Amino acid sequence: MMDLSNLLPSVIDIARASGQVILDIYQHGQFEKQVKNDNTPVTSADLAAHKLVVERLTELTPDIPVLSEEDAGIPLSERRQWQRYWLVDPLDGTQEFIAGSGDFATIIALVADNQPVMGVVYAPISGVAYYAYHGKGAWKITPEGETVRISTHKHELPTQSIAVAISRRQDIQAITNRLDPSLNYDLVPLGSAALKSCLVAEGAVDCYLRLGPTGEWDTAATQCIVEEAGGRILNTHLTPLSYNERDTLENPNFITLGDESLPWSTILTPDNRMMEV
């Protein structure tokens, strides 16, 4: 059995090193940008961070494969042979990086038997790191170096107001159409799928409803962090996400939720909860 506690400090260091590479390019203000086959952008910062993370993880654990967003063309026939693997988004929030909002992060997950067992998220602009590994809780390292245990926000029922993290680029009407109109909602815009899920994990918001394309690398690390903090990441049928089981690496629409005692099956209006966009 792999000792995750021994691996964790090195993985955090790798995420921070990746973040520094990204930050150097971001602050310099000059970078190359291309459009990938899926019509999403990739920058020289994505590629530099990818190179660093893959090289460092391979040095750390030569026997564990690395699957990165920037090198994701490995077929399922090969991937299904992996009992465990690293799943990485070197720069989550590329559009926010390009726009200059600062909402981006490096994400590293260790997946074993189709479920994430370790997750690290590092936000270069704030200097905050989030991490968790199976059975040991979820934690946040502040810019000052203080390590604080985090947990999701628990409501006193009945609740009348729910804080919802949304993408800065999300169609707000598409979100509100899927929420019970009898409740009040505080919509909190933020870039980076990982950082929004981390807001749920630390109790800053109650949920993050994601409609639209994401990859498995966008959710694996935060699924571990959120679950260890007391929450869940579920698809819109309210069943858990899983990893490395399909030809596609694209996620379904999903919700990151903090307090499972809330009636999510009615908060997410039944007619719309089942819809995929």
Segments (PLM) and residue ranges:
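Active-site-adjacent structural elements in enzyme catalytic cores
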Residues: L7, E55, E59, G73-G145, ...
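Acidic beta-strand-loop-alpha-helix segment within the catalytic core
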Residues: A109-C198, E245-V277
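Oxyanion/phosphate-interacting regions
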Residues: M1-D13, G19, R178-S182, K196-V277
